[in-house]
């Protein structure tokens, strides 16, 4: 399944969470890469329900005396021009985003690497529909 979304600015919270060693380790183990410390937010033209796909759910954990919630992780390919970049949609247990906004992680800062700006449209490829 290919989904198109418009690049939008986020709150900057992804940067904090992705800078924490436990999250870095979790994502590296699941995805095979250490994600850039930040997410790329995409606004879709419809609601996104990760529960329709074969995602991986991480456990809650404690770090430096604080409790952190797990996330649902869905590996994807990010399609920009003729490039296919490994990435993932991440859906935290606690989120402030509407269901039309998805957060994407990748091994690099996608905005810089591909000169993306708010309003640009990119595509993502999702495999692993629960019905497959």
Curated annotation (Swiss-Prot):
Entries under SUPFAM superfamilies matching the protein: Riboflavin kinase-like (SSF82114)
A Pfam family assignment: CTP-dep_RFKase
Binding site for CDP: 10-15, 108-111
NCBIfam families registered for this protein in UniProt: ribK_Meth (NF040694)
UniProt entry keywords in alphabetical sequence: Flavoprotein, FMN, Kinase, Magnesium, Metal-binding, Nucleotide-binding, Transferase
Cofactor names: Mg(2+)
Family under the similarity heading: Belongs to the archaeal riboflavin kinase family.
GO MF, one annotated term: magnesium ion binding
Claim: Magnesium is one of the keywords in the record: yes
Residues holding Mg(2+): 39, 41
InterPro entries: Archaeal_Riboflavin_Kinase, RibK_CTP-dep, Riboflavin_kinase_archaeal, Riboflavin_kinase_CTP-dep, Riboflavin_kinase_dom_sf
EC annotation from Swiss-Prot or TrEMBL: 2.7.1.161
Keyword Magnesium: yes
Binding-site residues for FMN, renumbered to this chain: 95-96, 103
Protein name: Riboflavin kinase
Pathway where it operates: Cofactor biosynthesis; FMN biosynthesis; FMN from riboflavin (CTP route): step 1/1
Subunit comment: Monomer.
Cofactor annotation remark: Binds 1 magnesium ion per subunit. This ion is coordinated by a threonine and an asparagine, and by the alpha- and beta-phosphates of CDP.
Enzyme class of the recorded protein, top EC level: transferase
Job description of the protein: Catalyzes the CTP-dependent phosphorylation of riboflavin (vitamin B2) to form flavin mononucleotide (FMN). Can also utilize UTP as the phosphate donor, although less efficiently, and it is unclear if ATP and GTP can also serve as substrates or not.
Reaction catalyzed: riboflavin + CTP = CDP + FMN + H(+)
Any one GO BP annotation for this protein: FMN biosynthetic process
């Amino acid at each position: 399944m290919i989904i198109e979304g418009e690049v939008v600015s986020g709150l900057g919270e992804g940067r904090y969470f992705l800078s924490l060693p436990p999250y870095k380790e979790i994502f590296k183990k699941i995805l095979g890469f250490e994600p850039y410390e930040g997410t790329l937010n995409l606004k879709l033209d419809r609601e996104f329900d990760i529960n329709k796909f074969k995602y991986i759910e991480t456990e809650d954990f404690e770090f430096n005396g604080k409790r952190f919630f797990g996330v649902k992780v869905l590996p994807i390919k990010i399609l920009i021009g003729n490039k296919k970049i490994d990435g993932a949609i991440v859906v935290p247990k606690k989120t402030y985003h509407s269901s039309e906004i998805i957060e994407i992680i990748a091994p690099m800062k996608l905005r810089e690497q591909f000169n993306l700006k708010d309003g640009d449209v990119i595509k993502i490829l999702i495999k692993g529909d629960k019905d497959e």
